[in-house]
Amino acid sequence: MKKSPTNWFKFSLSLVIFLLVRLIPFRPPNIEPILAAQMPLAGVYGARAGFLFGVLSILFYDIFTQTLGPWSILTAGAYGLLGLGAAFYLRNKKSIRSYVGFAIMGTIFFDAVTMLTGPLFFNQPLLLALTGQISFTALHLLGNISFAVFLSPVIYSLLAPDKNPKITQAVSLINPKII
């Protein structure tokens, strides 16, 4: 990430906003906009910013909610890897279709990693973890795809308004006054 005060401000503001969104009570735990924010951040600011956003999003939330533990390291690492992947995958692809594609791949990667390691942490039978993971992943995919369609382009247009006309056009369809 370039050392511009504006870039660091936008990055930090994104962390705070999405931490507050995750703190909304009574929301499903797997419907959260971390990946939707991480994709445009990684695409605009690069792999380091994508990695840091993923890791810090998980760690700050777990510290704030006093749930920090071994599981935090695993999920933070998985989200960090998603940030690296997003930076490379979205390097020359900045369309809603690209966001949706990465949201699908990223969600399946994240859920597979956490599902396969969950039994190691909690002495849970693998079949039980797999069975419970199906509905969790279905909701997770639904949330991440929806956020990739509606939220990621808006975030991208706020981070880099002049870089991609496809994204800006999609945002202007949602809110014509943005043009």
What do the PLM-derived regions correspond to, one by one?
Residues P25-F26, G46, T65-G69, L90-R91, ...:
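Short helix-capping/hinge motifs at transmembrane helix termini and TM-loop junctions
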Residues V21-P25, Y45-L52, L84-V100, L139:
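Hydrophobic alpha-helical transmembrane segments
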Residues I17, V21-R22, F53, S57, ...:
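Alpha-helical transmembrane segments of multipass membrane proteins
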Residues I73, K94-I179:
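Membrane-embedded alpha-helical hairpins and interfacial helices in multi-pass inner-membrane proteins
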Residues M1-V44, R48-L52:
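Hydrophobic transmembrane alpha-helices
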Residues F18-P33, L56-Y89:
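Interfacial aromatic-anchored transmembrane helix boundaries in multi-pass membrane proteins
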Residues M39-G43, G83-F88, P153, S157:
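Transmembrane alpha-helices and membrane-interface helical segments
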Residues K2-P5, M39, F88-Y99, P161-D162:
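Membrane-interface helix-boundary motifs at transmembrane edges
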